[in-house]
């Protein structure tokens, strides 16, 4: 791929934007190697910022118009970079014009922050560190429409750690599900925190999380010592409680998760110690109905510290990264079992955009065999987190070759932005997804 995909985002242009650090000399310091990889054509292109900016170790999320918002990043030091030193810069990348625009400064420096997009199109920035041992405790809010940044009130102030695992759930709150042993909820409207239930296992340092199909339940797996255990939290319950699910075949830290069109979850990469020791090269597929993890075909490269994984519109999974070893600059693509069960359904004449609370229609010659219609948001992944990833199944009806689906009205379930539209047949085989913008 030319560079190492330490950060990776799937864009609605079919490019994957990825970036890594550059270090070692005054001429390259405070810069990053930024490139795009087109998954359809295999073409790699340069996408560097036109100004000196180190976006390595930043947080990022996709905006409603498909641009990428990047907050914080790495230090300004000359020579080898020092971990933990944050910056206040943030930027927006436009995949159509392939342009970069600086945005207003964050309220405090951030290294290893987490971004979360909101139903109103704004973005919140949580956590990270200002400098080694000094936490970034405030919450910043970026409004892309007005291009303004503000820091929320003192009730939002809390130490949440580096790259906290955060997910927007259907009641409008944001769940923090790692890496400490206690979960928390943040209310964006009231801008305040409330405590949530403790995890069964306790602290899952460098564990993986995934927002499951429907966007109301969170899975967390691995992390810690490491552990093979996994657990889930259904936030729709009156009194949510973490409950154990099936254990992984392999204990692992530093892994990434991908929610597939059939609703199953792939955990990929990781290893049995930080950072590059005893890699686990066998992905596992989790069935939410049974709680069972099944080993899959191994990948060739180690995918531990600084690795990434993303669902592609054709239902395959791109895995890349880990910043050492002979295969660091090579990506691999995994084909899940559903791609070996026969022909795909097809989607013809999909809408370019839909409105929440409305309907979407498309034509499919295989409409009678369609068992699921699902919108899956583009992923934006780094350091075992992907707050953009969400899968929302739609209620639908079939009439002849026409499929009509209801689009949820709640922005908490379906935040604005670009989604992949999948039709999945009764064998679990997904179509290739067109892009649909949810307004």
Q: Regions from the language model: what does each represent?
A:
Residues 1-439:
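Kelch-like beta-propeller repeat domains
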């Amino acid at each position: 791929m030319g560079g190492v995909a330490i950060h990776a985002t799937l864009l609605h242009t079919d490019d994957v934007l990825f970036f890594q650090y550059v270090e070692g000399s005054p001429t390259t310091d405070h810069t990053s190697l930024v490139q795009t990889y087109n998954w359809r054509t295999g073409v790699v292109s340069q996408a560097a910022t036109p100004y000196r900016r180190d976006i390595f170790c930043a947080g990022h999320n996709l905006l409603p118009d498909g641009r990428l918002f990047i907050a914080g990043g790495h230090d300004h030091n000359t020579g080898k970079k020092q971990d933990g030193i944050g910056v206040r810069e943030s930027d927006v990348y436009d995949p159509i014009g392939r342009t970069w625009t600086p945005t207003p400064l964050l309220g405090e420096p951030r290294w290893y922050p987490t971004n979360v997009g909101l139903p109103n199109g704004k973005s919140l920035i949580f956590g990270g560190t200002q400098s080694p041992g000094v936490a970034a405790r405030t919450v910043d809010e970026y409004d892309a429409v007005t291009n303004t940044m503000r820091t929320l009130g003192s009730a939002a102030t809390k130490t949440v750690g580096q790259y906290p695992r955060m997910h927007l759930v259907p009641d409008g709150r944001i769940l923090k599900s790692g890496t400490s042993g206690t979960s928390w909820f943040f209310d964006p409207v009231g801008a305040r925190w409330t405590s949530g239930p403790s995890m069964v296992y306790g602290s899952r340092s460098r564990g993986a999380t995934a927002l499951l199909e429907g966007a109301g339940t969170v899975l967390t797996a691995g992390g810690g010592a490491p552990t093979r255990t996994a657990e889930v939290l259904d936030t729709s319950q009156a009194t949510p409680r973490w409950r154990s699910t099936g254990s992984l075949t392999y204990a692992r830290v530093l892994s990434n998760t991908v929610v597939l069109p059939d609703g199953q979850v792939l955990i990929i990469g990781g290893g049995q110690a930080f950072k590059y020791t005893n890699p686990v090269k066998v992905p596992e597929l989790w069935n939410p109905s049974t709680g069972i993890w099944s080993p899959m075909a191994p990948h060739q490269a180690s995918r531990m510290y600084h690795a990434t994984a993303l669902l592609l519109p054709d239902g395959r999974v791109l895995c890349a990264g880990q910043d050492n070893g002979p295969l660091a600059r090579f990506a691999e693509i995994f084909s899940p079992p559903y791609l070996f069960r026969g022909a795909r359904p097809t989607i013809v004449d999909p809408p370019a955009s839909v409105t929440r609370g409305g309907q979407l229609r498309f034509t499919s010659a295989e409409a009678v065999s369609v068992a699921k219609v699902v919108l899956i948001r583009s992923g934006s992944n780094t350091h075992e987190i992907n707050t953009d990833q969400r899968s929302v199944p739609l209620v639908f009806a079939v009439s002849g070759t026409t499929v009509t689906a209801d689009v949820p009205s709640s922005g908490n379930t379906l935040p604005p932005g670009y989604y992949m539209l999948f039709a999945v047949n009764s064998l679990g085989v997904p179509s290739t997804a067109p892009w649909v913008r949810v307004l």
